[in-house]
Amino acid sequence: MDDATFLASYDPAAFPPLAVAVDVVPLTFHTGALHVLLTKRAEHPARGRLALPGTFVHAQEELGAAAQRALRDKAGLNTPVRQFQAFGAVDRDPRMRIVSIGYMAVVDAGTMMAATASAVASELLAVTGDSVRNAAGRRTALPFDHGDILARALSDLRRDLDRDDWAFGLLPNTFSLRELQALHEAIRGQTLNKPAFRKRLIESGRLE
């Protein structure tokens, strides 16, 4: 039997149904702190709750394109995304078996604030540690496994902070060393020694 014959008789219905989705973690650096953009769910389950913007992947759609579509349609953002992990716990969604691919977007504050103003069903919440808090400082629980997805995105952001320039997308086109150090402190969750921070940047070749 060759491939053509096999595929002609192949029955996808012989396997349990499985859906693929994407969930995006849109981050920004605003008022000296990391923030994540969340959108209010319009449908059940978890209707009315704040969640990461996400969507199901269309049959003929690339994963990255689906992530950008979710950002554009639900958050009003047109920005590059970076894939960081798949999330496939059997019980992560009550509807059916859904595997979600996690993506991250880093956006400067000006762009993010404009998107928040135009997207009425979105809110910008501060990130503290691996959790989010509302304007009153109360911790906000996210539906599904979105809390785990956010935590993984933040872990990857911290890991790659000194490896590449991805996190620079959280800053405007021009910024001071003070702003850059404040960003690093917000991401790491700790105060950094100013001379040591600048020395490390110079030694890495990213600052002259």
Predicted segments — roles?
Residues 5, 9-51:
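N-terminal strand-loop-strand
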Residues 15, 88-98:
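Acidic pyrophosphate-coordinating catalytic loop
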Residues 16-18, 62-65, 98:
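Basic, often amphipathic N-terminal segments
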Residues 19, 78, 96-100:
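Short connector loops at helix/strand junctions that flank enzyme active sites
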Residues 24, 83, 103-105:
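A structural signal for short, well-ordered beta-strand segments
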Residues 33-78, 86-88, 159-185:
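Conserved Nudix-box catalytic region and its N-terminal flanking loop in Nudix hydrolases
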Residues 102-105, 113-162, 170-185, 196-206:
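NUDIX/MutT-family hydrolases
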Residues 186-192:
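Short, basic interhelical loop/turn and adjoining N-cap
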